[in-house]
């Protein structure tokens, strides 16, 4: 089957890889001059199934108001009055109750755990290198309340069968030695030993080369104008005066998927702006071993080979990609507080990207009402964590196989009024934002 994939971020390239493995004739189209040039370029570097959770959670609306008056707030909202922004925010608010949170988190953990397994298989099969580490993730607490609240996270992890260990402040240095100097600032941490890290951009670039060697065709520097429709199916992709035709089409355009699909398929995907710093390591002993998450500021600090990636924050500002100095100061403050001797902040590279976020936090993977149009978008802050699983899942669906995990509640049909999801095991309450 001839397949056209729109988008060459980590999700689009992973989709191309798994579809090519199934013997399909795959073409990937992107407006950039290479893969992973936008949202996949500078993310926090985490592959963290254990922390897969929606931003829409109980208590978040009140916290958002409080954060409006904080200098280093993890979430910022700038109202522009647009219908798309207001509609998305209203949908997110409707998902901030406990019942919706439980359902949404269960979906996300299911896909994230599966995706890590797919990545592990891919790594073993191909030997792909991307400065990856299998050193786990450590969530750091600065207050006793945060430490006590970890019991809720532990209940969720128990339900999902995710290994963990709860550490006191004195024990943190056993897994992150550089924290010994700052342990007095912390109350403890929650460690997930099965989480991984890696350079998402490097992974995507190398997987794209492998996919190309497997027969995938990449067309860069082409801006897609619209999808052409004939009856109940897509007839082609238009750019300029050219039309490319295929048997099936996959939209993996991230935050730009919504506009491309306007008038064809309604999806609630909205850009959530994030930031990162990439810092050269000057003292390996003073740098993180793997990844730590600062629970107070929602900032992740990740170790690559000779660099530290510091990423986080969320701004609801539409498609604004301007670099804000205040956000850089927050990133510098957190990494300087926890790892003051690890790297040279003055030589850091500052980056921003637009994560494609759904109001319920779960990505949209699968079929649409148009019989040859498929979606793989809306992964929010977890595109790197969920990419391989989403790609394999989509390849299974398009190849006529039964997916290895429940997939009906990952498709866009879950937003229809008559959708009735299959029963899933309930989760205890846990909040990703406190």
From Swiss-Prot:
Residue spans crossing the bilayer: none
Gene Ontology terms: biological process: D-alanine catabolic process
InterPro entries in the record: DadA, FAD-dep_OxRdtase, FAD/NAD-bd_sf
Oxidoreductase found in the keyword field: yes
One GO location term (cellular component): plasma membrane
Transmembrane found in the keyword field: no
The entry's keywords: FAD, Flavoprotein, Oxidoreductase
Co-factor(s): FAD
EC number: 1.4.99.-
Record pathway: Amino-acid degradation; D-alanine degradation; NH(3) and pyruvate from D-alanine: step 1/1
Binding site for FAD: 3-17
Top EC class, one word: oxidoreductase
Domain of life: Bacteria
SUPFAM superfamilies: FAD-linked reductases, C-terminal domain, FAD/NAD(P)-binding domain
Disulfide bridges in this chain: none
Reactions catalysed: a D-alpha-amino acid + A + H2O = a 2-oxocarboxylate + AH2 + NH4(+)
One GO molecular-function entry: D-amino-acid dehydrogenase activity
Family of the protein in this entry: Belongs to the DadA oxidoreductase family.
Role noted for this protein: Oxidative deamination of D-amino acids.
PANTHER family, alphabetized: D-AMINO ACID DEHYDROGENASE, SARCOSINE DEHYDROGENASE-RELATED
Record protein name field: D-amino acid dehydrogenase
Species of origin: Yersinia enterocolitica serotype O:8 / biotype 1B (strain NCTC 13174 / 8081)
